[in-house]
Each structure stands twice: as structure tokens, then as C-alpha cells.
């Protein structure tokens, strides 16, 4: 083992495995193998797989990009922020089902919610509409993450990333028109 064994090293190894192979392949034995240690030594730092998943989701939340809206039209700032979050989650394909399960509503995600809500209000939505768009945009992201079918029978269809952009902008236009 080239690095000291600690929670950060364990979470980094877990993220590499989950990103590469998916959550189904994320076992303490695999993490230990990647770190060059025995599985039992991991238990000095984490209690069990459930705690490992919690730490992995905390790590995911810590990586959410919060874009500065300065110099950008308010609606475009909202679109850019949600695209950045979408791109972050696409890089961690395992995140869709974990977020959708709803088991990890973490206090550390509050700054992300606050930032997104401020952008939505800045785009002209009242609190109630901003909350609805916030929830709908999350469901939109999760739906795109969990439904990665290429829909190849739609010849000439735009790329799926374009579908996300279209749906997000349509959601915002509809909410702003109310």
C-alpha cells in the first residue's frame, strides 16, 4: 500500500470502483484489493457498506459545481448551473439510482439547493414556482441518468444531451410564462 489507509483513501477507491464498474461491484473486498490491504483493515475506518455509501454520497455532494452567475442572463445562469450538475452526475453514473432512492438527503447538500433556488428566484420565479421547478429539474436529471437508452430507432434524433437541454429550457419557459 503506497498511501496511508484512512477514510479519504477508502472513499477515493470506492468512487473509482463505482465510477468504473457500478455500485453492484462495490464491495469492501474490492476496495481493499484496490488499496492493497485486507478487507478487515477497512473496518477500523468505516462501520459497514451503508456507511461507505453515505461517505460516497457525501463525496458526490462535495463535488457539485456551483457556478457564479455574474455576467450571465438569469435564465441562462439557471440552465448553465443545471447542465453543470447534470455533467457532474453523468461522470458518476451510479449516482442516479442512489439519488432516486431518497435514502441520502444530506445536510451538506443544502448549499447546492440554496444556490439553485437563488438562481431560480433571480430568473423571475416566486418561491413556490422556484421550489416546483427545482424538484422538477432534479427529476429531469435523474430521469436522464437512469434512462440512458440510445433510442436508436429514432434516426436523425438529436443527441441525448440536447434532449436534456430542450427539456430544461421548456420547463423554465413554462414556469416563467405562468
Predicted regions and their residues:
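Short, basic, alpha-helical segments at the C-terminal edge of helix-turn-helix-like DNA-binding modules
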Residues: 58-63
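Residues in the recognition helix of alpha-helical DNA-binding motifs
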Residues: 45-46, 133
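Helix-turn-helix DNA-binding motif, specifically the short coil turn and the N-cap/start of the second
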Residues: 38, 126
Amino acid at each position: 500500500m503506497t498511501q496511508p489507509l484512512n477514510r479519504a483513501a477508502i472513499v477515493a477507491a470506492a468512487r473509482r470502483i463505482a465510477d468504473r464498474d457500478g455500485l453492484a461491484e462495490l464491495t469492501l473486498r474490492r476496495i481493499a484489493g484496490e488499496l492493497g490491504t485486507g478487507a478487515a483493515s477497512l473496518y477500523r475506518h468505516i462501520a459497514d457498506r451503508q456507511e461507505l455509501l453515505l461517505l460516497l454520497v457525501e463525496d458526490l455532494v462535495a463535488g457539485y459545481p456551483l457556478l457564479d452567475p455574474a455576467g450571465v442572463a438569469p435564465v441562462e445562469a439557471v440552465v448553465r448551473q443545471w447542465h453543470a450538475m447534470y455533467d457532474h452526475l453523468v461522470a458518476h453514473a451510479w449516482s442516479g439510482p442512489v439519488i432516486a432512492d431518497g435514502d441520502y438527503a444530506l445536510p451538506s447538500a443544502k448549499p447546492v439547493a440554496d444556490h439553485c433556488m437563488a438562481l431560480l428566484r433571480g430568473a423571475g420565479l416566486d418561491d413556490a414556482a422556484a421550489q416546483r421547478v427545482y424538484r422538477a429539474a432534479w427529476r429531469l436529471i435523474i430521469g436522464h441518468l437512469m434512462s440512458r437508452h440510445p433510442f436508436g430507432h429514432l434516426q436523425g434524433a438529436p443527441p441525448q444531451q440536447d434532449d436534456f437541454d430542450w427539456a430544461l429550457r421548456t420547463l423554465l419557459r413554462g414556469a416563467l410564462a405562468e
